[in-house]
A protein has these predicted regions:
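A generic structural signal for short beta-strands and their flanking turns/coil linkers
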Residues: 93-95, 120, 151-153, 219-221, ...
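Short, surface-exposed interaction patches in beta-rich subdomains
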Residues: 201-204, 209-328
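A generic structural motif
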Residues: 79, 100-102, 186, 204, ...
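Exposed beta-strand and adjacent loop surfaces of beta-rich binding modules
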Residues: 75, 94-96, 110, 164, ...
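Short acidic/polar N-terminal linker immediately downstream of export determinants
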Residues: 2-95, 100-108, 140-156, 260-277, ...
Length: 328
């Protein structure tokens, strides 16, 4: 090896090392930024309202109920700020929304629950004092201006078959069972769990797990399951046409489907085409695991290591057979 070849090889190794160091540093800064934002948003809750809305020492206000005929292909928009949302199916052609307001020191009547009806569907909103009363699909709801109010609203919904759902809260879990139309479920501090017969699903949280179960994917649109601090899991039918794209920064990846895992150091990715491909299934987290499982499977999916580079496999040589005893 000449001196020039030696210097050239060392120069390439140094450049490669600098690039790798830059990538690792960038990933580290991304983790710090995302986790910091999530923690800051969650810590703000303590200054704006009481997050313990299931505590035993809370007083219950008058229950609220809304019943309305809602045919398939319509949408139910549900907007909450402090409190959970639970949705289950009904074979009746009417949507039922039950709300329970609880509090410690504030007045339950300080939080109004209002509805807005249109040709596209129905919007139900929990409106805290000092907040705009614009209850509609495009209404913007934040926790700003809620200092000192400890009222929480827990929604329980009966959703007719074929009705789309768009449900959001800031502090609380969102749980949807037995949906049969597209679902968009969002929270900031809490878990999001969606089970649907058709899909597609958008399940989003910042601090909590995001889990979507689809028995089929017949509706138009892509699937997005996203969290920052928590696990992201998707359960799929054994036969499905989709392109899967999953990412985690610090967690593990597991799959019961033939998907390829790549990545070194902290970041891992999961990619692959199922069936004929087509619509996208995106699964993303920062500090949690990514799991892809088959619907109905109770076993833990195997954790998949990043796919190593292929090397030639040397041929195997069979040993010569031993002579049998008693033969010449």
């Amino acid at each position: 090896m000449t001196g020039k070849d030696f210097l050239r090889r060392w120069r390439l190794d140094i450049i490669r090392g600098v690039v790798i160091l830059g990538v690792v540093f960038g990933i580290g800064m991304f983790i710090v930024s995302m986790v910091g934002r999530g923690k800051a948003a969650i810590s703000d809750f303590g200054h704006q309202f009481d997050t313990d809305f299931l505590g035993a020492d809370r007083t219950h206000g008058q229950p609220w109920q809304y019943v309305k005929a809602l045919p398939p292909d319509r949408t139910l928009w549900l907007r909450n700020i402090n409190g959970s949302i639970t949705v289950s199916p009904t074979d009746a052609g009417t949507v039922e929304v039950h709300a329970e307001r609880t509090f410690k020191h504030s007045s339950a009547d300080s939080v109004q629950i209002i509805t807005s009806e249109s040709g596209k569907g129905v919007t139900v909103c929990a409106v805290w004092p000092g907040r705009a009363s614009d209850c509609g699909p495009d209404g913007h709801f934040t926790a700003e201006g809620m200092h000192g109010n400890d009222v929480a609203v827990v929604f329980e919904v009966k959703l007719p078959r074929g009705v789309r759902l768009d449900a959001s809260t800031i502090n609380g879990d969102v749980s949807v069972d037995g949906a049969s139309a597209p679902v968009d479920a969002v929270t900031v501090n809490g878990d999001v769990t969606v089970e649907t017969a058709n899909g597609p699903v958008t399940a989003t949280t910042v601090n909590g797990d995001a889990h979507a179960t689809m028995h089929a994917l017949t509706g138009p649109g892509d699937v997005k399951v996203t969290t920052v601090h928590g696990d992201a899991q998707v359960d799929l039918p054994s036969t499905i046409d989709a392109v899967v794209d999953g990412h985690t920064v610090t967690g593990d990846i597991s799959s019961e489907f033939p998907l390829t895992v790549t990545g070194k150091f902290a970041s891992h990715s999961l990619t692959g085409t199922l069936g004929k491909g087509g619509r996208q299934i995106q699964i993303t987290t920062v500090t949690g695991d990514v799991d892809v499982r088959e619907v109905g499977s109770n076993a833990d999916a195997p954790v998949i290591a990043p796919t190593p580079p292929r090397h030639p496999v040397p041929p195997t040589h069979r040993a010569a057979p031993r002579p049998r005893s008693g033969t010449s």
